[in-house]
């Protein structure tokens, strides 16, 4: 980021929020391909059209020419960009990838300036996503209902442009973004919003992630603000909160007259806001209120999406579940609140009593079926979970194969270290371990049994001992606390994203 700031010469352009001139800078395309500012890498790959510096120079030169952008979106077969029909897709891809870097500039500079004003970075800026689970463990034990919410992509592309307009004042950049979005849509007049999102993901993942994160940020900021100010909302905007007209009057009346008989109703009015947690596009609302209260929030969210983002969600797509008999699928874990009963014998004088205590426990379980499906999709096993060789890796060296399998196994083990039950995690490790052995034996044209017999029992030992090695650096091996942690749940403070296999769709 420091190199990025040093090489971006905004000066007067940034003072007026002009980002469009950056599209004519060569280093922008170097950033788009994750090569930093090392132009020699581009020169070394001059035979590859995607990384050719010559093509970047040619693209910029022709953009400077008059009538540089000639593109008809009505007929994709006749489209011509920059006067070269056969290079239309290549040049269009280069411009969109460079533009994805450019639109991140205002947010990057704002982040740098905000961090520069503070000597110490606040802890919430460095918070691990694993910190969500201790929060859920602390809160969900006292709640009753949970509402699963999926923040969908807006059907109207203009909403994305309008959202970015609050941050970027450069009209040329906004017009260029609008041009790209409508070009994708006009490639097929019958394309649906869902197909458009899938196409945009494949065409330019960086631009898609930026726009989607910006949309989610806008959604969440408005939602939290309106929830905090819900008592001041006008009923014409949100039909679900029409009773807010008489909210204060009803509350005073209930407090004065029905305090003794309607304590539950009073509690609903006094504490209407549930706990809210979000990761990426999925969020949950949990409350200790009644089912009626959760249904109110459900229809409030539907009206909120319709009024602000033109997202027409079906009520059946928002699920209200009771925590006592429902598993919550969130961030790659299956979480639930389990009831534990224990019987205690108590004796008073000559009489003995059996006292049954019921306590709640927050369980986080590894979803074995989705994980095995992800491993099968990645060609580590078949659909039944039987390990197979990774044939595309047989051309690599033995050390590279071991390093790749070991890294995947360590990442999965690291992420699912907070699981209440480790048996499913051991099965995943077994699949990866045997898949690695099959891959190496296939490379050396040998059987798995002969290959393992030749290498000995220490082969791939790190697949199962990585977590123990990490803990042994912190606690003595023979301590009772250490032995408990090997079997218990561990939440780490350095995890910033879900592992790909856990987040696979």
From Swiss-Prot:
- Decide whether keyword tRNA processing is in the record: yes
Q: Does the keyword Amino-acid biosynthesis apply?
A: no
Q: Which GO terms describe its biological process?
A: mRNA processing; RNA splicing; tRNA processing
Q: Which domain of life is it from?
A: Eukaryota
Q: Which Pfam families match?
A: Intron_maturas2, MatK_N
List membrane-spanning regions: none
Q: What are the annotated GO cellular component locations?
A: chloroplast
Cross-referenced InterPro entries: Domain_X, Maturase_MatK, Maturase_MatK_N
Q: Which UniProt keywords apply?
A: Chloroplast, mRNA processing, Plastid, RNA-binding, tRNA processing
Can you say where in the cell this protein is located?
Plastid, Chloroplast
From the record, give the cysteines joined by S-S bonds.
none
A single MF term (Gene Ontology): RNA binding
Q: What does this protein do?
A: Usually encoded in the trnK tRNA gene intron. Probably assists in splicing its own and other chloroplast group II introns.
Which family is this protein grouped under?
Belongs to the intron maturase 2 family. MatK subfamily.
Q: Supply the name of the protein.
A: Maturase K
Please name the source species. Spinacia oleracea (Spinach)
């Amino acid at each position: 980021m420091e190199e990025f700031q040093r090489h971006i010469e905004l000066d007067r352009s940034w003072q007026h929020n002009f980002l469009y001139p950056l599209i004519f800078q060569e280093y922008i395309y170097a950033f788009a391909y994750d090569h930093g500012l090392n132009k020699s890498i581009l020169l070394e790959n001059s035979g590859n059209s995607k990384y050719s510096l010559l093509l970047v120079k040619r693209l910029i030169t022709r953009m400077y020419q008059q009538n540089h952008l000639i593109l008809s979106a009505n007929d994709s077969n006749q489209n011509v960009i920059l006067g070269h029909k056969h290079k239309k897709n290549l040049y269009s891809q280069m411009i969109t990838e460079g533009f994805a870097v450019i639109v991140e500039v205002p947010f990057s500079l704002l982040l740098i300036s905000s961090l520069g004003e503070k000597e110490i970075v606040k802890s919430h800026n460095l918070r691990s996503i694993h910190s969500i689970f201790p929060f859920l463990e602390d809160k969900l034990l006292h709640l009753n209902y949970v509402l699963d919410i999926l923040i969908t992509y807006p059907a109207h592309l203009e909403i994305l442009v309008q959202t970015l307009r609050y941050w970027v004042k450069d009209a040329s950049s906004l017009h260029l973004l609008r041009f790209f979005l409508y070009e994708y849509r006009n490639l097929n007049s019958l394309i649906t919003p869902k197909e458009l999102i899938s196409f945009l993901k494949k065409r330019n993942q960086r631009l898609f992630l930026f726009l989607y994160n910006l949309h989610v940020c806008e959604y969440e900021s408005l939602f939290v603000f309106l929830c905090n100010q819900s008592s001041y909302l006008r009923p014409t905007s949100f039909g679900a909160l029409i009773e807010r007209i008489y909210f204060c009057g009803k509350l005073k009346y209930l407090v004065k007259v029905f305090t003794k008989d309607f304590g539950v109703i009073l509690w609903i009015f006094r504490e209407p806001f549930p706990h809210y947690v979000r990761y990426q596009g999925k969020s949950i609302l949990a409350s200790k209120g009644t089912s009626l209260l959760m249904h109110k929030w459900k229809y409030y969210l539907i009206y909120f999406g319709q009024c602000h983002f033109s997202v027409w969600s079906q009520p059946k797509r928002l699920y209200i579940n009771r925590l006592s008999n429902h598993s919550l699928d969130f961030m790659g874990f299956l979480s639930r609140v389990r009831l534990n009963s224990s019987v205690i014998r108590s004796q008073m004088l000559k009489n003995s009593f059996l006292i049954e205590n019921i306590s709640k426990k927050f369980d986080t379980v590894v979803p074995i079926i989705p994980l095995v499906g992800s491993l099968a999709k990645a060609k580590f096993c078949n659909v039944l979970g039987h390990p197979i060789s990774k044939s595309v890796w047989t051309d690599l060296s033995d050390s590279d194969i071991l390093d790749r399998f070991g890294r995947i196994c360590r990442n999965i083990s690291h992420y699912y270290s907070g699981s209440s039950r480790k048996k499913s995690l051991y099965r995943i490790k077994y699949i990866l371990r045997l898949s690695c052995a099959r891959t190496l034996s296939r490379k050396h044209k040998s059987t798995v049994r002969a290959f393992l017999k030749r290498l000995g029992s220490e082969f791939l030992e790190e697949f199962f001992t990585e977590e123990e090695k990490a803990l042994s650096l912190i606690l003595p091996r023979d301590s009772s606390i250490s032995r408990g942690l090997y079997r218990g749940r561990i939440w780490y403070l350095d995890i910033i994203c879900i592992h790909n296999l856990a987040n696979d769709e």
